[in-house]
Regions:
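Acidic, small-polar-rich N-terminal luminal/periplasmic segments of exported/outer-membrane proteins
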Residues: 72, 86-89, 132-280, 629
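Outer-membrane beta-barrel translocator/receptor signature
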Residues: 241-244, 253-336, 342-348, 396, ...
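Acidic/polar loop-and-plug regions of large Gram-negative outer-membrane beta-barrel proteins
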Residues: 320-324, 337-405, 418-450, 495-521, ...
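Structural signature of Gram-negative outer-membrane beta-barrels, strongest in the C-terminal barrel
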Residues: 341, 450, 469-481, 523-649, ...
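Surface-exposed extracellular loop regions of Gram-negative outer-membrane beta-barrel proteins
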Residues: 359-371, 480-484, 580, 584-628, ...
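Membrane-embedded beta-barrel scaffold of Gram-negative outer-membrane proteins
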Residues: 401-417, 421-427, 594, 620-683, ...
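Gram-negative outer-membrane beta-barrel transporters
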Residues: 541-542, 646-648, 666-752, 817-819
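Conserved C-terminal beta-signal and adjacent last beta-strands/turns
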Residues: 595, 627, 714-820
Length: 820
C-alpha cells in the first residue's frame, strides 16, 4: 500500500481545539516503509538544502519545514497560534533551519526519543509539560512548496510584498517551476508562458524579440523583472537554462513592482527567479536536438561548501545552433550564468552574473497587411525573408542582493545590478497589399546599445496589535537607463516588389535615408525612475480575513532625442501616486475569496523608428486602473482559480488614413478590457497532471479622436483563449509519462478601425518522457512535437503596430539528460 504525503496543513483556531489537540493534520511516518538511509536522525546531518517556505503562522511554517527536512515533530497548536513566522528562504541545515524559525519565539526544540522531536516553551529544569503524540510526516516530498507533480509553485515573489503564498494574496498569480521548463523542453520564456491561457506571444518589431500579451495588453521582454529588479535581463529573448521559477502576476502592478522601463506590462508582469545551489550537489548534462538540424547542450553544476554549507555556487552553460524548422532560417545561442550565495545565521548574500548571445540569420519576418484584405498564411515552413537579413542580440548583466535579519520580526534587504545590451541587425519586413500575396520588401539596419542600472532597498516585518496581525513592507527602488540608436533604411518608394507566396531574393538595397551614425549611435533616450512604497496586510479572525492596503509614490524623468536630427523630442519629470487595496476571505480551509483595486503606471509609449509619420515620438506617462474579484481553491494536490476583471487604460495605436502610405502613432482615447479567467493545475488524480485554463475577453475603445473608432474592439486582443495541457504516468512503467497540449485562440482585429482581422487557430502538441537509472546515474529521455498537424496560421496581431506574426511549423524536440 502506498501513502501519498500530505501537501497542505490548515491553520486551526484555538477556540476549537483544546491544549492537547493535534497541532496540524498529518500523516504518521510509521505507516509507510522508510528507507534505511533515512533512519538516522536527520537533525544530526550537516548537509544544507534550499527552502522556499512562505510566511505564515509559526505552526504552519514549522510543520512544512519538518516535513521537508524529514524530522518527526510533535507540538501543541495552542502555544503557537499567536506567533507569526517570516517563513524560510535560502539554504539551511536542519539544525540552523529550526534555530532560525524559533529564534526569539520563546520556544525550543526538544528530543522525544527515537529521533522524534517536539516544540515546547523555554522552561526551567524540572518543569514538565504533557503533550500528545502528534507528528509531522517526515517522508513528505521535497517539493512541498509545489502542487503535486511539481509544475506549479505554491508561492511567488510579489515585488515589495516579498515571497508570499499564492492563496493568501488578493491577486491572480501563478508560478511555473524548473520542472515544467525541463519536461516541456521550453527553450525560451515564451515557451513557458504559453502554459497560461491569459498569455499569448508575438514577434517584436523587426528584430525577432518576444512580445507577450497578458489580459490583452502587451508586455515587452525588457520590462521583465529579475529577482524583483527591472532592466537587468536580456532585452529581447530570455532563455531558460538558468531559471528556477517564472512568476506571472496578472493585472496592473504599479504598486507591486513600480514602473516598468519601457511602459508595457499593464496587463501583467513577470519575474524570473534564478537557480541556486541546492543542498544536494547538482551534476546535470543535457544534449538536445530540434528540427531541422539544431543541436545543443546544457551543463548545470551546483555545489554547497564551507562550514555548515553556507557557501553555494551554481553554474549553467548552454549552447545551441543550426537550422530551425523554418526553411533557410538558422539560429545560434550561447548562455553563461553564474550564481553565488552565502547563508549565515542572519545574513544572506547572493550574486548573479550572466552573458547571453543570440544570432538569427534569415529569420522569418513579420508581415504588414497594408491593403484592404488580409492574405491567408503561407505554408508553415515557408520563409519570405531575405538571405541578407540577420539579427544579433548580446547582453551582459549582473546583480547582488543581501538580506539581514534585524531580529525575529524584521528583515532589511538591499540589491542592485547593471546590464549592457548590444543589438545589431538588418531586417526585411514584408508589406502585402492583396490576397494574392503581392508585396514589397523593406529594408532596415538598426544598431542599438543600452545601459541600465537598477537598485532596491527595503524593510519587511510583522507585529500584532491586539488580535490583529500586521505584515508591513517598506521599499525604495530606482532605475537609470540610457539608450543609443541609429538606423539606415529605404524610402517607401524604394521598396522592392515581391510576393508572400512566391518570395524572391533581391540584392541588399542601397540606403536612401538614415539616422545618426551606425558606427557610433547617438543617445536617443534617458530614463530615471524612482519610487517609495509602503504597505500593510492586516489579519483578522485568526488571519482568515486579510486586508492589504498600500501606496507607492513614483517619479518618472524621461528625455528623448530624435534619432535622425538629434533634436529633443521629449522631456518630462512627473510624480504620481498609485494606491492598492486588496481583500482575502478564507471561510474554509480550501477556499479563498479575493478582490483588488490596483493601478498601473507606465512611461508613455514611443512611436516606432520607421513606417510612421512621427518616428520615435515619446508620450507622457499613462495610468491604468483595474478592479478584480475571484476565488481560489486549494485541494492539497491540485488547485483552481476563477476570476473576473476590468482594466481601463489609455489606448495607443497607429492610425492609417485613406490615401496615406504612412500611419501616425498616437495615444488616442481609452481601451477597456473586461475578462473572465479559469485555471486548474496540479494532480487531481494519481498519475494525471493538468495545466488547463480558459480566458474570455471583451474589449472596447472609447473617447477616440472624433469618435472614429468608438465602440470598436482593440487590435491584437482575441475574444477567447483556451489551454489544456496534460501529463499521464504510464501504469506499470515507472518513470514513463505521456503528455499532450491543445492551444485554442480566438480571432483578432489587426487595426483599430476593425477593417482587417485574422481567424481563430488551434495548435496540438504531443510529448513523452522516460526516466531510469543506469550505473548509478539517472537518465531522462524526452521527446516533444509542437504543432503536430503542421498547421499554417497567423498566431497574433500586434496590439499597436498593425503587423502579423506567423505560427511556428511542426517542430520535433528530443533530449537526453544525465544526472551524475
Amino acid at each position: 500500500m502506498t501513502f501519498r504525503p500530505l501537501q497542505h496543513v490548515p491553520r486551526m483556531s484555538p477556540t476549537r481545539f483544546p491544549l492537547k489537540a493535534l497541532s496540524l493534520a498529518i500523516a504518521l511516518t510509521g505507516l509507510a516503509p522508510v528507507p534505511s538511509a533515512l533512519a538516522a536522525d536527520p537533525l544530526q546531518s550537516s548537509a544544507a538544502r534550499s527552502y522556499a517556505i512562505a510566511p505564515g503562522p509559526l505552526g504552519d511554517v514549522l510543520a512544512q519545514f519538518a516535513a521537508i527536512s524529514g524530522v518527526p515533530l510533535s507540538f501543541d497548536s495552542k502555544l503557537l497560534n499567536d506567533h507569526h513566522s517570516d517563513g524560510l528562504q535560502g539554504s539551511y541545515t536542519v539544525q540552523s533551519g529550526f534555530a532560525h524559525l524559533l529564534q526569539g519565539s520563546g520556544y525550543s526544540l526538544l528530543s522525544t526519543g527515537e529521533n522524534g522531536y517536539t516544540v515546547a516553551p523555554d522552561v526551567k529544569v524540572g518543569d514538565a509539560m504533557e503533550l500528545s503524540a502528534t507528528t509531522v510526516n517526515g517522508d513528505m516530498s521535497a517539493q512541498s512548496d509545489t502542487y503535486a507533480g511539481g509544475q506549479v509553485a505554491r508561492s511567488a515573489r510579489l515585488g515589495v510584498l516579498g515571497n508570499r503564498d499564492i492563496k493568501d494574496v488578493p491577486f491572480s498569480v501563478v508560478s511555473y517551476t524548473s520542472k515544467t521548463i525541463a519536461d516541456q523542453q521550453a527553450r525560451t520564456l515564451g515557451d513557458v508562458l504559453l502554459n497560461d491561457a491569459s498569455v499569448r506571444q508575438s514577434a517584436g518589431f523587426g528584430n525577432f524579440s518576444q512580445v507577450f500579451t497578458i489580459r490583452g495588453l502587451p508586455l515587452q521582454t525588457d520590462d521583465i523583472a529579475f529577482n524583483g529588479l527591472y532592466g537587468l535581463l536580456p532585452r529581447q529573448i530570455i532563455t531558460t537554462e538558468a531559471v528556477e521559477r517564472v512568476d506571472l502576476f496578472k493585472g496592473p502592478n504599479a504598486f507591486i513592482n513600480g514602473v516598468s522601463p519601457q511602459g508595457s506590462g499593464i496587463g501583467g508582469s513577470v519575474n524570473i527567479v534564478p537557480k541556486r545551489a541546492d543542498d544536494t550537489p547538482t551534476r546535470s548534462m543535457t544534449l538536445d536536438y530540434a528540427s531541422d538540424t539544431t543541436v545543443g547542450g546544457h551543463l548545470d553544476l551546483g555545489q554547497r561548501f564551507g562550514e555548515d554549507n553556507r557557501f553555494g555556487a551554481r553554474i549553467n552553460l548552454a549552447q545551441h545552433g543550426g537550422e530551425t524548422a523554418i526553411d533557410d532560417e538558422t539560429k545560434r545561442s550561447q548562455l553563461i550564468a553564474v550564481a553565488l550565495d552565502y547563508h549565515g545565521d542572519r545574513l544572506r548574500i547572493s550574486t548573479d552574473f550572466g552573458y547571453q548571445k543570440e544570432r538569427i540569420n534569415q529569420g522569418r519576418a513579420v508581415v504588414y497587411p497594408n491593403g484592404s484584405v488580409v492574405p491567408h498564411p503561407p505554408s508553415a515552413k515557408d520563409n519570405y525573408s531575405q538571405d541578407w537579413s540577420w539579427s544579433q542580440l548580446e547582453d551582459t548583466y549582473g546583480m547582488v542582493n543581501a538580506e539581514y535579519d534585524l531580529n525575529d520580526h524584521w528583515t532589511a534587504y538591499v540589491g542592485g545590478g547593471a546590464k549592457h545590451t548590444r543589438e545589431n541587425g538588418e531586417y526585411s519586413s514584408l508589406y502585402v497589399s492583396d490576397k494574392s500575396g503581392t508585396a514589397k520588401t523593406g529594408f532596415l539596419y538598426s544598431p542599438h546599445d543600452e545601459d541600465n542600472k537598477s537598485a532596491v532597498a527595503g524593510l519587511n516585518g510583522h507585529f500584532d496589535t491586539g488580535p490583529v496581525t500586521h505584515q508591513m513592507n517598506f521599499g525604495l527602488s530606482g532605475m537609470w537607463g540610457e539608450q543609443r540608436s541609429a538606423y539606415e533604411a529605404i524610402l517607401v518608394a524604394n521598396r522592392q516588389p515581391n510576393n508572400l507566396y512566391n518570395p524572391v531574393q533581391i540584392p541588399r538595397p542601397s540606403v536612401t535615408y538614415f539616422g545618426s551614425d551606425i558606427h557610433d549611435p547617438r543617445i536617443v533616450g534617458k530614463n530615471r525612475i524612482k519610487s517609495a512604497a509602503v504597505s500593510d496586510t492586516l489579519g483578522f479572525v485568526d488571519d482568515r480575513v486579510l486586508l492589504t492596503v498600500g501606496v507607492r509614490r513614483q517619479t518618472l524623468e524621461v528625455d528623448a532625442w530624435n534619432t535622425a536630427s538629434g533634436a529633443r523630442s521629449a522631456n518630462y519629470d512627473e510624480s504620481i501616486t498609485t494606491p492598492v487595496y486588496g481583500l482575502v476571505l478564507k471561510p474554509w480551509d480550501h477556499v479563498s475569496f479575493y478582490a483588488n483595486r490596483i493601478e498601473g503606471l507606465a512611461q508613455g509609449p514611443t512611436a516606432p523608428a520607421t513606417n510612421v509619420t512621427n518616428p520615435n515620438e515619446v508620450f507622457p506617462p499613462r495610468r491604468s486602473k483595474q478592479t478584480e474579484a475571484g476565488v481560489k481553491l486549494d485541494w492539497d494536490d491540485y488547485g483552481a482559480t476563477f476570476g473576473v476583471y476590468r482594466i481601463e487604460q489609455p489606448n495607443s495605436a497607429t492610425t492609417l488614413l485613406p490615401g496615406n502610405r504612412l500611419g501616425t502613432f498616437n495615444v488616442d482615447g481609452e481601451q477597456v478590457n473586461k475578462g473572465l479567467e479559469m485555471n486548474i493545475f496540479g494532480e487531481p488524480l494519481d498519475g494525471l497532471r493538468l495545466l488547463a485554463g480558459a480566458t474570455f475577453m471583451h474589449t472596447e475603445l472609447s473617447k477616440t479622436s472624433n469618435g472614429l473608432t468608438d465602440g470598436n474592439r482593440a487590435a491584437g486582443v482575441p475574444r477567447f483563449q483556451y489551454n489544456l495541457s496534460t501529463q499521464w504516468d504510464i501504469p506499470g512503467l515507472e518513470g514513463a509519462a505521456l503528455s499532450g497540449r491543445i492551444l485554442r485562440t480566438g480571432g483578432e482585429y489587426i487595426n483599430a478601425e476593425n477593417t482587417l482581422s485574422i481567424p481563430a487557430w488551434t495548435r496540438v502538441d504531443l510529448g513523452a518522457r522516460y526516466g531510469f537509472k543506469a550505473d548509478d546515474k539517472y537518465i531522462t529521455l524526452r521527446a516533444n512535437v509542437e504543432n503536430v498537424a503542421n498547421k499554417a496560421y497567423w498566431a497574433s496581431a500586434s496590439t499597436a503596430n498593425n503587423y502579423l506574426t506567423q505560427g511556428e511549423p511542426r517542430t520535433l524536440k528530443v533530449s537526453a539528460t544525465v544526472d551524475f
